[in-house]
Design a protein with these regions (language model features):
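Mature N-terminal segment immediately following signal peptide/propeptide cleavage
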Residues: 123-131
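Acidic/polar low-complexity surface segments
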Residues: 12-24, 85-97
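Repeated polar recognition positions within modular binding domains
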Residues: 17, 41-47, 62-72, 205-206, ...
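Extracellular, surface-exposed repeat architectures
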Residues: 32, 93, 97-106
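Consensus positions within tandem repeat domains that build extended binding/scaffold surfaces
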Residues: 21, 41-44, 64-67, 156, ...
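Structural signature of tandem-repeat unit edges
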Residues: 2-9, 26-39, 49-62, 72-88, ...
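Feature responds to low-complexity, polar/acidic, surface-exposed segments characteristic
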Residues: 106-117, 132-182, 190-210, 218-248, ...
Length: 296
């Protein structure tokens, strides 16, 4: 069924299970919020897990914390404005938007150079505040990514949590730019970063595809139980599997088995090749979707 919410002003905040439409949540597959509504309150549609599509108006300026919490079936969000206008909406924490596809009525692109295969992945990551573009309006999808830059993307994906002062301990800690310092400290504390055997992190070195898979896998482990992860292992069939260093194989196996990383058309993974911004966006977009699926 379709639930239509109309009127002027705010949809009020609701405690769990107290919204008037909550009792009918099992029948609602589509939600339409009509023009005039300016805010969706805290917990408004929380628990309406079978909603698959949501239509939102240009008048909307705020979505409260948990307004769409546990809306696990959500596939599509239709918004009356542009991507830039969507980004301006104050969206609170705990909303199940991670793997949903955003469709904007205004097709204006946020970047001028993303017409390739990576387009949708970049848009997904941009909408989730994982990546940003350049001041000139480009994204530079073919540009290589450094280790510090990829950790920054994961830090953004994790919500940029506040981090107490953490001693990095790497011999090259002074090479970590202030721009990436909080992200790298978070990465160390979360166990995503371990560094090399010579006790360096090498923040400005370009990240390899195998390293990217490993960092992504460690991020996945923060949000998915060990029991679930245990069922995802198993050697993959990349034709160049033998060239994957032993320390990266578990990560590559799991990430490939759940579709977060993919190989090239010839069946190879090329673990030592440098990852680009477009490839990084693809991996992180798929990781968002995997986290949503594996947590449900």
């Amino acid at each position: 069924g379709v639930l239509t919410v109309f009127g002027e002003g705010e949809i009020t905040d609701f405690a769990a299970g107290e919204a008037p439409w909550y009792a009918e949540r099992g029948a609602v597959r589509k939600l339409v919020v009509e023009s005039g509504v300016t805010s969706v309150g805290i917990g408004a549609f929380s628990g309406c897990g079978l909603i698959e599509t949501v239509t939102l108006p240009l008048t909307l300026g705020r979505i409260g914390d948990g307004a769409f919490d546990d809306v696990y079936a959500l596939k599509n969000i239709y918004y009356a404005g542009s991507i830039a206008q969507w980004k301006a909406i104050d969206i609170g924490l705990g909303n199940s938007f991670g793997s949903a596809k955003l469709v904007c009525a205004d097709k204006t692109e946020p970047f001028s150079d993303i017409s390739g295969w990576y387009h949708d992945y970049i848009i997904t990551c941009y909408m989730a505040d994982i990546v940003n573009g350049r001041p000139d309006g480009t994204f530079c999808p073919e540009q290589n990514v450094t280790r510090a830059q990829f950790v920054m993307m994961l830090y953004n994906m994790g919500g940029r949590p506040e981090i107490s002062d953490t001693f990095l301990g790497f011999d090259d800690a002074n090479a970590v730019s202030a721009v990436y310092a909080a992200a790298v400290k978070w990465g160390v504390k979360a166990g995503i970063i371990t560094g090399f055997t010579d006790n360096t992190f090498r923040p400005n070195a370009e990240i390899s595809r195998a390293q990217m898979a490993t960092f992504a896998y460690r991020f996945l482990k923060l949000g998915v139980s060990a029991d679930v992860l245990g069922g995802l292992s198993g050697r993959n069939d990349f034709r160049d599997y033998g060239s994957i260093a032993e320390c990266y194989r578990e990560s590559v196996d799991v990430m490939a088995n759940i579709g977060v990383i993919q190989g090239y058309p010839n069946g190879s993974f090329v673990p030592n090749a440098t990852a680009t911004r477009g490839q990084s966006a693809a991996v992180l977009s798929r990781l968002l979707a995997a986290l949503t699926e594996l947590r449900t």
